[in-house]
C-alpha cells in the first residue's frame, strides 16, 4: 500500500525566512510557489531526491494548517507516501475503519491525523522534478 516517502510538509511561521534557510543550508531550490484558499495556506515546493519538501505558512488561523501552528508551533505536518493504487488503498483503509478523505477521481487521499498518532498521512502518485 505505501511506497517511498515522497513529500514532507513543514508548517512555518515565515515562509520567506524558511525558504532562505532551506536553500542556504541544503542547496535546495524552489520549484513552485502557490496558495490554497481552500486549505488556508501559502506554500513553496523544494524538490529533493525522489520527492519534495513543502513549506506551508498558514493564511487562515481557522483552517487545519493554522490550527496546527497555533497548537504545535512549527514542525512536520504531513508525510506523503507514493501509492500506485489510491482507490484500492482507500477502500482497504475504510474497510478497517480508518477515516480517509478521498475525492472521487483524484490521485490523492489523506488519512486523518487522529488515525495515526497525530501524523497527517497523504497517499499520492509520485511527482517527478526532472
PLM feature spans:
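A short, acidic/glycine-rich surface segment
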Residues: 31-33, 62-67
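Vicinal oxygen chelate
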Residues: 1, 44-47, 54, 90-130
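Short strand-coil-strand connectors
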Residues: 13, 47-49
Amino acid at each position: 500500500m505505501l511506497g517511498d516517502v515522497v513529500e514532507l510538509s513543514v508548517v512555518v511561521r515565515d515562509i520567506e525566512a524558511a525558504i532562505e534557510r532551506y536553500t542556504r543550508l541544503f542547496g535546495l531550490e524552489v520549484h513552485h510557489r502557490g496558495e490554497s484558499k481552500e486549505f488556508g495556506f501559502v506554500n513553496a515546493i523544494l524538490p529533493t531526491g525522489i520527492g519534495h519538501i513543502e513549506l506551508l505558512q498558514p493564511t487562515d488561523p481557522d483552517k487545519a494548517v493554522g490550527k496546527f501552528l497555533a497548537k504545535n508551533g512549527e514542525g512536520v505536518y504531513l508525510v506523503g507516501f507514493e501509492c500506485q493504487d489510491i482507490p484500492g488503498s482507500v477502500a482497504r483503509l475504510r474497510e478497517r475503519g480508518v477515516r480517509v478523505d478521498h475525492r472521487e477521481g483524484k490521485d490523492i487521499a489523506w488519512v486523518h491525523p487522529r488515525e495515526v498518532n497525530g501524523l497527517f498521512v497523504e497517499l499520492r502518485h509520485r511527482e517527478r522534478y526532472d
